[in-house]
Regions:
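Basic polycationic patches enriched in arginine
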Residues: 5, 362-363
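Bacterial N-terminal signal peptides
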Residues: 10-18
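Intrinsically disordered, low-complexity serine/threonine-rich segments
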Residues: 17, 26-28, 347-348
Length: 369
């Protein structure tokens, strides 16, 4: 009888956990003033990000991290108690609201970049007449920093970062800096040293992704740096290892983030509501390994996630909406997002449930029951 009760309890736990993992849902996991850019540490289960917030006292630290298995118990001045702030760089932001970009490798790279180390843009305004823009390097928990890992010659902080995890650009960190009507694309080795890949007139990008080198799945996008431009053009573009740019036509929407769908859990930084939101979107299971884009603007039919793909028949890049945030009761006006594998303790709970069931069956066999 005891074994039967154990089995029933384990079965109920397994069913409840599976239902949670497979259901569509949205939940606020943290409160952060003015979150702008986020990234995700795959081995630590942390969302790491930057903010733009008008309260100048908040800039004693520039970045923050959230353990996604935690939930806020208290919120003070827009900041929940499960947020770890770090950085403490000589930064002071005024004017503009573009925020500081952050990124991290999802795995150890052959070039020497290590998983979960943090690379973040910031502006040193200690000399207000001569601001300087840098990429800072942080160890995974943010307690150690190399503030001047790389210093840009131009102080513009309209910069996007992305790691080449495919090898097209030597498994290096890529930076795309926009200055007066011109974009400069660079690759950085582990010391921060930069090599220019190309410069492009009248181009400004909102997102970067080095597409896996699988021509069957990605067609002419395979192995290329895929980006979306902003402003009047809003085009899909690719750049190859030699810096040659190809324009694939108009998107007509603002794609803030490009990603490969590796799971069905999304972390969304929603700037207007000062929140980090966890979305569970089972529809993404149908697009594992595909390119997806996070669309944020006020144009109909609304913000959401698009599937971006190479159409072999027309030899062109196409996209279709596969999820609308309104279906989750959300209406983000300015945000970025990351999509990740199942990160929470629910996955461990599911595995534990399965192991408990197997242990029960083994004990039953041993006892002849």
């Amino acid at each position: 009888m005891k074994h039967i009760r154990t089995l029933l309890a384990t079965t109920a736990l397994f069913a409840a956990t599976t239902a949670t993992l497979c259901s569509q849902s949205a939940e606020v996991i943290a409160n952060v003033p003015g979150p702008v850019f986020i990234t995700y540490q795959h081995s630590r289960y942390h969302v790491v990000g930057s903010s733009y917030f008008y309260n100048r006292n908040w800039w004693n630290h520039d970045y923050w991290a959230i353990d996604v298995n935690s939930r806020p118990s208290q919120v003070t001045n827009f900041l929940s108690d499960n947020v770890q702030r770090f950085g403490n760089l000589p930064s002071y932001q005024f004017g503009g609201n573009d925020g500081y970009f952050v990124t991290t490798p999802t795995k150890n790279l052959p070039s020497g970049f290590q998983q979960d180390w943090i690379y973040a843009v910031y502006v040193d305004r200690s000399d207000r007449n001569n601001p300087t823009t840098h990429i800072a390097q942080f160890n995974p928990d943010g307690t150690q920093a190399t503030p001047n890992w790389y210093t840009f010659a131009n102080p513009s902080y309209n910069i996007r970062l992305a790691f080449d995890e495919v090898g097209t650009f030597g498994y290096n960190l890529l930076s795309a800096q926009y200055t007066t009507n011109q974009l400069t694309l660079r690759k950085h080795d582990t010391s921060g040293a930069a090599t220019d890949i190309g410069t492009y007139n009248d181009l400004r990008v909102s997102s970067l992704l080095v597409v896996p080198n699988d021509q069957v799945r990605y067609g002419s996008l395979a192995g290329q740096l895929l980006a979306t431009s902003t402003g009047a053009s809003e085009d899909f573009i690719t750049i190859d290892s030699n810096g040659v740019l190809q324009n694939w036509g108009r998107v007509g929407r603002n794609i803030a983030t490009l990603s490969i769908a590796v799971g069905n859990v999304i972390y969304l930084a929603d700037y207007p509501s000062n929140t980090i939101i966890e979305l569970r979107a089972p529809v993404l299971d149908n697009y594992r390994g595909e390119i997806i884009g996070f669309i944020y603007d006020n144009r109909a039919p609304g913000s959401g996630i698009a599937h971006i793909y190479w159409d072999q028949a027309t030899q062109s890049v196409k996209w279709d909406m596969i999820l609308y945030f309104r279906d989750y009761g959300l209406d983000p006006k300015g945000a970025t997002a990351v999509v990740v594998p199942e990160p929470s303790s629910l996955l461990a709970l599911l595995m534990l449930s399965g192991m408990s069931a197997r242990a029960f069956r083994r004990r039953a066999r041993e006892n002849g029951n």
